[in-house]
Amino acid sequence: MNLIEYEAYFWAKFFVAERAVSGVIIILIYLIIASVLAYILSFHIAKIYLDEKTVFSKITGRIISFFERMIGESPDHGMTFKEYFINLLLFNFFAGLISFLVIMFQKYLPFSYDTVGMSPSLDFNTVVSFLTNTNLQHYSNPMRLSYFSQTFVITGLMFLSAGTGFAASMAFVRGIRTDTGNIGNFYHDFLVSIFDLILPLTVILTVILILAGIPETMQRYITVNAFLTNKVYNIPLGPVATLEAIKNIGTNGGGFYGANAAYPFENPDWFTNLVEFVSFVIIPLASLISLGIVFGDRKFGRMLYWVVMFFFIFDALFAFFGEFAGVPFLHLGYYTGNMVGKETAIGISQSTIFAVGATITSTGASNAALVSYTPAGIIGVLIGLLLNDPLGGVGTGVLNIFMYIIFTVFIASLMVGKLPEIMSLRISSKEIKYSTLSLITHPLLVVIPLGITLMIPHLMSSFVNPESSRITELLYEFASAASNNGSEMGGFITNQPFFNYLDGVLMLLGRYLLMAFQLIIAQSFSVKKAKAQYYRSIDTSNWIFGVLLIAAMILIGLLSYFPIIVLGPLLSWAHDFNLILEAMV
């Protein structure tokens, strides 16, 4: 190597290292901004969990009282688990039924324009997807839904699913902190969730997105004459900003356009990318931090924050360096990283932190084509799905993390020979049984359908990638549906009756079966008397318990899928590594 070649090599490596450092800094900036805003919001959420008045109560209190009088409910009417869950199910069922009929007959309703429509299986999948806060979209054409369907059904279900999730978390927290024998009133909790938390934040975000250039109109499309091709194109418009706001605030994730946040009308630049990331992280993160205020132990909230941040930072850096390294054997991204399927205005670091944030939470939004990620990059994104979204969605994150906490307290107490207790409440066999059922249900909902699908030849013929990639794509599809995430990797034709109905069933079970287990635990806690304040068998707020909690999440959440991970993304990763070794030899 002569001097000129050496100098060129040196500067190439220097700029690569510089971009790597800047990428890590960008990821940390995203997390710091989200953490600061979540900390501020946590005080507001704590008041909601404690059934106290908030800054919006003077206005929203009258609205909530009006709706309660209209339906004949009162916050003083406490419900047991059975009453609470049945009312939750009936409310969601009738909302889903009405939504299904609206989409089925949308061509006869206002603002239908040139709507293509949906098949019954796709209609079922779409309604269930948005009803369960999953937002898994097996369609990509915005013309399949009319503006009336987008506004009345899609946006409406986004509010409903987010409100239902947070109401369930209010019931769970109430079951732990009170001993009244009931877990609250579902309709009151739902209305408080909507009017005191979700709606105000959605309005604020909508204004920000409109000012940032995201369209908000009832105009169907604009006609553009392409200068180079001399062709006429119709570019769909619509009430994008409104849907985009609740999509992120409600951790829904379903986009107005098929490309989701990779489409410039949904996410035009770095500013909207940052705003949307913060907006779908802020409520789940603030909810966990607020638990320290609710239970009178700030260290408990900080412990939960750092547990979640461990997975957040690890997954983000793993995915970033996996994408930044590219695939050298294919000369893919040797200097620039793997930019395939990513927006040049956003880049690798902002794409990966967005994707990881969407799977650590239950949002599932995407600003890049996940099918074009490297095997290492997709592992970083996939970890969140396999852990059933550690940060969770609006409300559901609190439910999910407590299942791990109860299990960890039980194991840790056995290790030191003490009785398991949490928040001064004795953990009995009933809580252990239902928390364990909750933790093992998710892997079963993923592994069983995956094995069945692999044995059906005509379904596998729709895949375009090699065998190991097919396993990864199926694992991603079913993990996304079962965890109510909605993130889509693609790589095969998802709009088939088999996948539409199967994913629909997985979404329903992943949402309501787990929620039933969790509310049963809340009911069980609600009849127990707490011991003296701050008395516990083991300290659940120190760093040692945090490490045990991380270990439990890894052992239960990830090892359940280890054989599939080996046959899927790890095999693809090793295959790339072997090719590199052969090239070197």
Curated annotation (Swiss-Prot):
Q: List the InterPro entries.
A: KdpA
Membrane topology per the entry is: Multi-pass membrane protein
Query: What HAMAP family is this protein classified in?
Result: KdpA
Q: What is its main location?
A: membrane
Single GO cellular component term: plasma membrane
Respond yes or no to whether keyword Transport is given for this record.
yes
Protein family (similarity comment): Belongs to the KdpA family.
PANTHER family, sorted: POTASSIUM-TRANSPORTING ATPASE A CHAIN, POTASSIUM-TRANSPORTING ATPASE POTASSIUM-BINDING SUBUNIT
**Entry keyword set:** Cell membrane, Ion transport, Membrane, Potassium, Potassium transport, Transmembrane, Transmembrane helix, Transport
Looking at the UniProt entry, the stretches that span the membrane are: 23-43, 85-105, 152-172, 194-214, 275-295, 307-327, 345-365, 367-387, 397-417, 444-464, 502-522, 547-567
Q: Per the record's keyword annotation, is Ion transport included, yes or no? A: yes
| One annotated GO molecular function | potassium ion binding
What role does this protein play?
A: Part of the high-affinity ATP-driven potassium transport (or Kdp) system, which catalyzes the hydrolysis of ATP coupled with the electrogenic transport of potassium into the cytoplasm. This subunit binds the extracellular potassium ions and delivers the ions to the membrane domain of KdpB through an intramembrane tunnel.
What is any Pfam family matched here?
A: KdpA
Q: List the protein's name.
A: Potassium-transporting ATPase potassium-binding subunit
Q: Where in the cell is it found?
A: Cell membrane
Subunit organization: The system is composed of three essential subunits: KdpA, KdpB and KdpC.
